[in-house]
């Protein structure tokens, strides 16, 4: 068994062991009602959901950007050994990957500016508006984070191919760059959808 397969199996076993332990404890102490999804959604603060959305927006976007830069950068450095001329021109791919992280930062700032304080602590007093705002911010952060994660990987793989193709045949660079531009638009789609998700958000008393 390889190291990666061992890691996956360890995570799988640990997850189900924790789930079993929690289930047994809840059964013994008569806390089974806490498995109720509605209870969980109403007892958690909308601020938790909004902060989770902010964290997911920035963290997943940065992971996507870093992953894409890693994939592209290694190919540029490797191909630049044989064809040094590709190093400067293919930095465009690195910029496209970095733009993915910028999308996440922008959306995190937008979401954080929408979070307004409220004085209520009881679920009924908090109201549907604040819960809707918290869930919308979480959904927006998850949307932009996941779209930027896959966008970064997409741009990184295409940028890697562009660097290696340019090293072999310079006329291929512009053609592959068009594919890379369309790949980078995936992250922009995520930002647009996230803005639409939070367009009706109103939090506060």
UniProtKB/Swiss-Prot annotation:
- Gene3D superfamilies tied to this protein: lithium bound rotor ring of v- atpase
Which residues face the membrane's Cytoplasmic side? 25-51, 112-137, 197-205
Gene Ontology process terms (BP): endosomal lumen acidification; Golgi lumen acidification; intracellular pH reduction; lysosomal lumen acidification; proton transmembrane transport; regulation of macroautophagy; vacuolar acidification
Keywords recorded for this protein, A-Z: Cytoplasmic vesicle, Hydrogen ion transport, Ion transport, Membrane, Transmembrane, Transmembrane helix, Transport
Q: Where in the cell is it found?
A: Cytoplasmic vesicle, Clathrin-coated vesicle membrane
Topology versus the membrane? Multi-pass membrane protein
Q: In chain numbering, where does the site feature Essential for proton translocation fall? A: 98
User: This protein's superkingdom?
Assistant: Eukaryota
| InterPro entries found in the cross-reference section | ATPase_proteolipid_c-like_dom (IPR002379), ATPase_proteolipid_csu (IPR000245), F/V-ATP_Csub_sf (IPR035921)
- Membrane-crossing residue ranges in chain numbering: 4-24, 52-72, 91-111, 138-158, 176-196
Q: Which GO terms describe its molecular function?
A: proton-transporting ATPase activity, rotational mechanism
The stretches that face the Lumenal side, renumbered to this chain, are 1-3, 73-90, 159-175
Which Pfam families does this one have?
Answer: ATP-synt_C
Report whether tRNA processing shows up as a keyword of the record. Answer: no
* Chief place of localization: membrane
GO CC terms: clathrin-coated vesicle membrane; endosome membrane; Golgi membrane; lysosomal membrane; membrane; phagocytic vesicle membrane; plasma membrane; proton-transporting V-type ATPase complex
Please describe the organ and tissue distribution of this protein's expression. Ubiquitous.
UniProt subunit comment: V-ATPase is a heteromultimeric enzyme made up of two complexes: the ATP-hydrolytic V1 complex and the proton translocation V0 complex. The V1 complex consists of three catalytic AB heterodimers that form a heterohexamer, three peripheral stalks each consisting of EG heterodimers, one central rotor including subunits D and F, and the regulatory subunits C and H. The proton translocation complex V0 consists of the proton transport subunit a, a ring of proteolipid subunits c9c'', rotary subunit d, subunits e and f, and the accessory subunits ATP6AP1/Ac45 and ATP6AP2/PRR. Interacts with IFITM3.
Its function, per the record, reads: Proton-conducting pore forming subunit of the V0 complex of vacuolar(H+)-ATPase (V-ATPase), a multisubunit enzyme composed of a peripheral complex (V1) that hydrolyzes ATP and a membrane integral complex (V0) that translocates protons. V-ATPase is responsible for acidifying and maintaining the pH of intracellular compartments and in some cell types, is targeted to the plasma membrane, where it is responsible for acidifying the extracellular environment.
Q: Tell me the protein family, please.
A: Belongs to the V-ATPase proteolipid subunit family.
Record's protein name: V-type proton ATPase 21 kDa proteolipid subunit c''
Which species is this record about? Homo sapiens (Human)
